[in-house]
Amino acid sequence: MTDQDLVPLPSREARQWAMFCHYSSFFWFLAPMIGNVIGPLIVWQLKKDMDPFVDQQGKEALNFQLTFSIVMMICGLLAWILIGFPLMVLVSVVALVLVVIAGIRANEGKPYRYPFCWRLVK
């Protein structure tokens, strides 16, 4: 039995809002390069006081999307030497998979921490 097994699950509503914090990054398809940050930021700001789990997962989603945006900008600069485009595809696929995993874990009530993420928002 781990310490995490002893912690009670967040409420269903809190789990759903935490999941939506992660999945709101798909606003990237509507507004490239800003939608992925705006979505989690709005959801987190509206619901962070609802439950500590939503606050934690909202910060995690926002930090990952900020990191993703910075990495995509770097890939854009590297496009001048032709390596940026394949890196953009790779980074996008990895980000998509990680966001889906994070959303599933949040819906299960398990906290998720993204790998390779700068935690700019504390």
What are these regions (language model features)?
Residues 47-69, 104-113:
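Amphipathic, cytosolic membrane-interfacial segments at TM-TM junctions
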Residues 11-14, 33-36, 48, 52:
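Residues at secondary-structure transition points
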Residues 94-122:
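Juxtamembrane transition segments at transmembrane-helix termini in multipass membrane proteins
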Residues 9-12, 16, 56, 79-82, ...:
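Juxtamembrane loop-transmembrane helix junctions in multi-pass integral membrane proteins
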Residues 19-38, 63-99:
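Hydrophobic alpha-helical transmembrane segments in multi-pass membrane proteins
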Residues 39-44:
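Hydrophobic transmembrane alpha-helices of multi-pass, membrane-embedded glycosylation machinery
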Residues 1-14, 115, 119-122:
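Low-complexity, intrinsically disordered extramembrane tails and loops of integral membrane proteins
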